[in-house]
Amino acid sequence: MNIIDLINKKSDGKELSEQEINFFVNEYTKKNPTITDYQAASFLMAVKFKGMTIKETYYLTKATINSGDVFDLSSVSGIKIDKHSTGGVGDKVSLILGPMCVALGLKVAKLSSIGLGHTGGTLDKLASIGVNTVMSNHQALINLKKVGMFIMAQTPSICPADKVLCSIRNATGTVQALPLICASVLSKKIALKTDYIFIDLKYGSGAFMDNAKKAIEFGKMMMQVLKMFKRKGLIHITCMKQPLGRSIGNTIEVRSAINF
């Protein structure tokens, strides 16, 4: 098996097997990769134009999860939830909604990442005011038990392949490929063993997805993959045709969230 065969197969619109997808993820994201950046870029571009079946997307999500460890939260009592937004201009909802859910008695566990494309991620916003989101699983568990919530950056042990793939996607114009977004988002959500997963799927000029039809298609894709993993989830499709709130920019968005 070699990457050239996989690129050609996907370029022809054919379905890849689980073994082939595992080969791509493992060989490109390992410490000494046998797949070069330009070969990975070619493969990802083929995925962008030819798409992936639900089975392929499931395999890619699974391979990303299996590249690292899962985060077991069973030692924490109560209902544990994870909330994720696909991102939009001025989107600071996670910073507001998380503490509100804790006030209602829920436990909020959020594994986050930097923003892709033109939207700032939750980690970017917190980093702008000096909040340290780099912590061990042990420290995150302490926070969850003590205050009912944590927002942490991806650790090297959780979905390490996703960090590598996000970097190459951001540099090659493949950020908007739906199967790649799906695998990236859900791998982190599924690796974190919460009871429920809530996703805010945005569309419009301020989001990476420009219309409702595409958002609905993506939402259905994510729900199908979640069901294949036997995880409970809910997806809200929300309009992002204007900025959320009255501030745009990481630091002032945090200030707006605090003043909400």
What residue ranges belong to the model's regions?
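Glycine/serine-rich anion-binding loops at beta->alpha junctions
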Residues: I79-V102, L106-H118
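Short, glycine/charge-rich beta-strand/loop segments that flank catalytic centers
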Residues: S77-I81, S113-T119, Q139-K145, S157-P160
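Buried hydrophobic packing segments
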Residues: V47, L60, L97-L104, T122-K125, ...
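Acidic, glycine/proline-rich low-complexity segments that act as flexible tails and inter-domain linkers
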Residues: M1-G90, S128
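Glycine-rich anion-binding loops and their surrounding alpha/beta cores
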Residues: K9, G105, S128, N132-V134, ...
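Active-site-proximal loop->helix
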Residues: G115-V131
